[in-house]
Curated annotation (Swiss-Prot):
Disulfide bonds: none annotated. This is ATP-dependent Clp protease ATP-binding subunit ClpX. It comes from Shewanella amazonensis (strain ATCC BAA-1098 / SB2B). GO terms for molecular function: ATP binding; ATP hydrolysis activity; ATP-dependent protein folding chaperone; protein dimerization activity; unfolded protein binding; zinc ion binding. ATP-dependent specificity component of the Clp protease. It directs the protease to specific substrates. Can perform chaperone functions in the absence of ClpP. ATP binds at P120, T121, G122, S123, G124, K125, T126, L127. Keywords: ATP-binding, Chaperone, Metal-binding, Nucleotide-binding, Zinc. One of its GO terms (biological process) is proteolysis involved in protein catabolic process. SMART domains: AAA (SM00382), ClpB_D2-small (SM01086), zf-C4_ClpX (SM00994). PROSITE patterns: CLPX_ZB.
Length: 425
C-alpha cells in the first residue's frame, strides 16, 4: 500500500469507505483498486480500542486473585497494618467469589459481608480500599458521610453515592454492580445520645437508617447522566447487593468505651487495681478488642452494625512506619518527588536524617501519613520554584537541617567543560 493524492492522469480519487474526495481529507492511502482516508483509519482504531476495553475486564474476571495475592499487592503500597490487610483480603475475596457463584449453593444462600475499618486519621483506611479496587480493576468511589442527610432535607441523598459510582464507569450498570464504595467519616453520623430522641436527627441516626437498605442490598433507582429526578424520567436500576461497601472512621473516644467495658486497670478506692505507665495498653491494642456493643454505645444503631459484620482495626502509625512510608512503597513520596525532579534532569536525594525529621514532624502534627505530603511539599517548594530557571544543576540533597528550616537543599552543579579543562571542582 502507498499514499496517493493524485490519480492516474489527474483523476480525482475518493475514499472507498466514506466517499470523501482527496481534497477533503489530509491523507488518502491507496491499495489494489481501493482507497482509504486518514479519518476512516482513525475511526477503525477507535472501534478496536472500544472492543479491547470491553474484553479486558472479562479477562480480568477469569481468575480471581487469592487472599495471598491480594495481601501481596497491598504490601506493595501500604506499610504495616498486617491484621487489617489479612481481614480485608479474605473479605474481598469472599465477596467476589459470592458474585461469581451467584445463586444458592445446595440450598445455602451466601450473605453479604461489608467491612468496617476503625483507625486514626492517616493510618491508611482509604488507601487500602482504593488499592484493592485498582488491583481488581473494578469501579471505585468515595463518599463523605458528613455530607449525607435523610431524603427530603438539605444535603446529599444516600442514592448520590450510587450516582457517583455510575459516573466512574460511564453509567454502565453491570460494571457499577461489581464496584467498591468507601464511605469515610462514618463515625460522624453516630447517634447524638444512647437513648432514641423525639427530635429528628437528620444527619446522624437518620442517615444510618437511610444507609441500611443501600448497604444490605436493594434496587436503587438512579436518574441517568446525573439528571434530577422527575416522573417522566426513566431510572437506572442498580442492585446494591452486589456492591461491596467499606465504611471507615477514626472513632475518637471509642477506646474509652472499650476500657469501661473491659474494666482493665480502672476503678477507684483502695482496692482498685491501677496499671502503671509501662503496663498501659496502646490505643491500637484497646481498639482491637472492639465489640458490637461498644459501637452501639458510641452511637451506631444495632441494625447498622449488623450490616457491617467484618470489622478491622488499624494501628496508629509510629515513627518507623512513617519513615518506611516515605521511601518503601511503589508510589512512595520520595519516589514521586524524585520522578518530578528527574523531569528537570536533576537527581533528588533524601538523607536518612531528613526522613527521620519529616516523620517526627508528622508525628507532632498528629496527622499520620496524610501529613507527610504537605511537609515534603513545603521543604521543596522554593527549590521547585527556582530549579526550572537554573542551569547546570545535577543533584539536590535534602538533609535534617533542610527539614528544620535551617538551610535550603544542597544543589550540586555539573562540571562544565572549561572547569574540567582547568581542573576546577
Amino acid at each position: 500500500m502507498g499514499e496517493n493524492k493524485t490519480g492516474d492522469g489527474g483523476k480525482l480519487l475518493y475514499c472507498s469507505f466514506c466517499g470523501k474526495s482527496q481534497h477533503e481529507v489530509r491523507k488518502l492511502i491507496a491499495g489494489p483498486s481501493v482507497y482509504v482516508c486518514d479519518e476512516c483509519v482513525e475511526l477503525c482504531n477507535d472501534i478496536i480500542r472500544e472492543e479491547i476495553k470491553e474484553i479486558s475486564p472479562k479477562r480480568d474476571q477469569d481468575k480471581l486473585p487469592t487472599p495471598h495475592e491480594l495481601r501481596a499487592h497491598l504490601d506493595d503500597y501500604v506499610i504495616g497494618q498486617e491484621k487489617a490487610k489479612k481481614v480485608l483480603s479474605v473479605a474481598v475475596y469472599n465477596h467476589y467469589k459470592r458474585l461469581r457463584n451467584a445463586g444458592p449453593k445446595d440450598g445455602v444462600e451466601l450473605g453479604k459481608s461489608n467491612i468496617l475499618l476503625i483507625g486514626p486519621t492517616g493510618s491508611g483506611k482509604t488507601l487500602l480500599a482504593e488499592t484493592l479496587a485498582r488491583f481488581l480493576n473494578v469501579p471505585f468511589t468515595m463518599a463523605d458521610a458528613t455530607t449525607l442527610t435523610e431524603a427530603g432535607y438539605v444535603g446529599e441523598d444516600v442514592e448520590n453515592i450510587i450516582q457517583k459510582l455510575l459516573q466512574k464507569c460511564d453509567y454502565d450498570v453491570e460494571k457499577a454492580q461489581r464496584g467498591i464504595v468507601y464511605i469515610d467519616e462514618i463515625d460522624k453520623i453516630s447517634r447524638k445520645s444512647d437513648n432514641p430522641s423525639i427530635t429528628r436527627d437528620v444527619s446522624g441516626e437518620g442517615v444510618q437508617q437511610a444507609l441500611l437498605k443501600l448497604i444490605e442490598g436493594t434496587v436503587a433507582a438512579v436518574p441517568p447522566q446525573g439528571g434530577r429526578k422527575h416522573p417522566q424520567q426513566e431510572f437506572l436500576q442498580v442492585d446494591t447487593s452486589k456492591i461491596l461497601f467499606i465504611c471507615g472512621g477514626a472513632f475518637a473516644g471509642l477506646e474509652k468505651v472499650i476500657e469501661q467495658r473491659t474494666h482493665t486497670g480502672s476503678g477507684i478506692g483502695f482496692g482498685a487495681q491501677v496499671k502503671g505507665k509501662e503496663e498501659k495498653e496502646s490505643m491500637s491494642d484497646i481498639l482491637s478488642q472492639v465489640e458490637p456493643e461498644d459501637l452501639v454505645k458510641y452511637g451506631l444503631i444495632p441494625e447498622f452494625i449488623g450490616r457491617l459484620p467484618v470489622v478491622a482495626t488499624l494501628a496508629e502509625l509510629d515513627e518507623d512506619a512513617l519513615i518506611q512510608i516515605l521511601s518503601e512503597p511503589k508510589n512512595a513520596l520520595t519516589k514521586q518527588y524524585a520522578a518530578l525532579f528527574e523531569m528537570e534532569n536533576v537527581e533528588l536525594e533524601f538523607r536518612e536524617d531528613a526522613l527521620k525529621a519529616i516523620a517526627q514532624k508528622a508525628m507532632s502534627r498528629k496527622t499520620g501519613a496524610r501529613g507527610l505530603r504537605s511537609i515534603v511539599e513545603g521543604i521543596l517548594l522554593d527549590t521547585m520554584y527556582d530549579l526550572p530557571s537554573q542551569q547546570g544543576v545535577s543533584k539536590a540533597v535534602v538533609d535534617e537541617s533542610v527539614v528544620k528550616g535551617e538551610s535550603a537543599p544542597i544543589l550540586i552543579y555539573e562540571q562544565t567543560e572549561s572547569q574540567a579543562a582547568s581542573g576546577d571542582q
